[in-house]
Amino acid sequence: MAFVLMNNTNAFLVTLLLLSLSYIPLSFSTIQQDFVMCLVDNSDASFPMDSSFFTHDLNASSFKLALETSAQNLRYLMPSNPKPEFIFEPLYETHVQAAVLCAKKLKLHLRLRSGGHDYEGLSYVSEMETAFVIVDLSKLRQISVDIESNSAWVHAGASIGEVYYRIQEKSKIHGFPAGLCTSLGIGGHIIGGAYGSMMRKFGLGADNVLDARIVDADGKILNRAAMGEDVFWAIRGGGGGSFGVILAWKIKLVPVPEIVTVFTVTRTLEQDGTKLLYKWQQVADKLDEDLFIRVIIQPTSKTPKSKERTISTSYQGQFLGDANRLLQVMQRSFPQLGLTKKDCLETSWIKSVMYIAGFPSTAPSEALLDGKSLFKNYFKAKSDYVEEPIPVEGLEGLWEKLLEEDSPLTIWNPYGGMMAKIPETETPFPHRSGTLFKIQWLTLWQDGKTSEAKHMGWMREMYSYMEQYVSKSPRSAYVNYRDLDLGMNGKGSDAREWGNRYFKGNFERLVEIKAKFDPENFFRHEQSIPTELE
């Protein structure tokens, strides 16, 4: 059960509030009581404190639901994983300010959650400090679209799908270049970079941010002018949970055509899949900027009734234009795929987003408002950036590795276009010119702890095999595909071990900004930006 905090500045009414909860008098801890009283004392009285507050002690089922609803990686919901003291869901910005002030006063460690998609569960689990609380921003999801200024203010708890839907409500010829997974929380998504199917045309979501509102470690709300250009730079790609609580982003809308074309073409190894993928590597970053073709690679049965497996390569594309122009582009640049008019689906931009995200073709656009993840598994993920085509022999070795595992999945996303034009120091996200494509590595399973060691072991072996074919010095990684194998704060490793992989030459600047903006390191987690380097 969630209990409701009613706004009262009067100490007597605060006492009545706590007494009203005392039907389980020994279960409501001193920490929780102190936090409730502090919240009421530090919130603006004009905004009712009717936020939800979930604690395991008062009602385990409601607490479990609040903890698990948005969590994507089931590995971090096992009974053995640390659980928060409580979960607080603010309804107004002033409640977030109060939560920061009270956590600081009571020396409580905060975990900040907007969408719950952190691959290593860092928005809802803490291994480094087990006495922690979650501030869940999912109720802060207001979206205000202004077509005249080509901009929108979007609060951190809104999902990417909601943002897309609210934009298309106002205009069929405007969009935003962000994520492919529509259940992502926009707060954490943009702060890590935010790539999507229009990145080759318009860059990342973080490249299209005009302003932001953030709560700092002193509980102050700062916009771009107040936080300064250094902090504004840092929060557009520097990773979540390091500089403050993102309340909202002001994003720049981009033009999209009335007709967008999507397609999926699948080839197996028996259909020259290896040769085709080698060719894709040579052209994917050089294609027309209106065209995005990613490759989804996984084992599949050779025939519907066969137990023998092969490798499937699915080329999934989005083109900002009609099918006739797409076919001209493909014939000129990538005829080897053999794309035909029959493969193409002409649709609206919003429907193309849903196609890429995996929604059924019959799903209405209102399905984007649901915000629920279509992907929920036990999994381990890693990432790589590729700067030279992987040779055929390297691909053949990869196929052998993939066929060893039960449910592996790898997704290759093309770069080039606008991504190659933006300097790598423009934001903390450095993976720009020279990158051909990014690889996401995944292994998924359904039976919890019993087979985790097996799947984790396979992932690390495969990752080791691929080292010779990917970026070097550093072997780069994407911060929003969080990977604790790269190193952790407080575990005896130099933060450069993971920081340089995520941010390359931008890491030291991030550390300098962190030291000035949050010198006490209030906002921290296993891979947060440190205040100093060893």
Curated annotation (Swiss-Prot):
GO molecular function: cinnamyl-alcohol dehydrogenase activity; coniferyl-alcohol dehydrogenase activity; FAD binding
Cross-link (6-(S-cysteinyl)-8alpha-(pros-histidyl)-FAD (His-Cys)): 117-181
One GO cellular component term noted in the UniProt record for this chain: extracellular region
Subcellular location as annotated: Secreted, Cell wall
Coarse class of the protein's main subcellular location: secreted
Co-factor: note: Binds 1 FAD per subunit in a bicovalent manner.
Cofactors, names only: FAD
E.C. designation(s): 1.1.99.-
Reactions the enzyme catalyzes: (E)-4-coumaroyl alcohol + A = (E)-4-coumaraldehyde + AH2; (E)-coniferol + A = (E)-coniferaldehyde + AH2; (E)-sinapyl alcohol + A = (E)-sinapaldehyde + AH2
Glycosylation sites: 7, 59
Listed SUPFAM superfamilies: FAD-binding/transporter-associated domain-like
Transmembrane regions listed in the UniProt entry: none
InterPro entries: BBE (IPR012951), FAD-bd_PCMH (IPR016166), FAD-bd_PCMH-like_sf (IPR036318), FAD-bd_PCMH_sub1 (IPR016167), FAD-bd_PCMH_sub2 (IPR016169), Oxid_FAD_bind_N (IPR006094)
Disulfide bond positions: 38-102
Pfam families documented for this protein: BBE (PF08031), FAD_binding_4 (PF01565)
UniProt signal peptide: 1-29
PTM entry text: The FAD cofactor is bound via a bicovalent 6-S-cysteinyl, 8alpha-N1-histidyl FAD linkage.
Biological pathway: Phenylpropanoid metabolism
Keywords: Cell wall, Disulfide bond, FAD, Flavoprotein, Glycoprotein, NADP, Nucleotide-binding, Oxidoreductase, Secreted, Signal
Family: Belongs to the oxygen-dependent FAD-linked oxidoreductase family.
Function: Mediates oxidation of p-hydroxylated derivatives of cinnamyl alcohol (i.e. the monolignols p-coumaryl-, coniferyl-, and sinapyl alcohol) to their corresponding aldehydes. The electron acceptor required for these reactions is not known, but does not seem to be dioxygen. Is much less efficient towards cinnamyl alcohol.
Protein name in the entry: Monolignol oxidoreductase AtBBE-like 13
Organism: Arabidopsis thaliana
Organism lineage string: Eukaryota, Viridiplantae, Streptophyta, Embryophyta, Tracheophyta
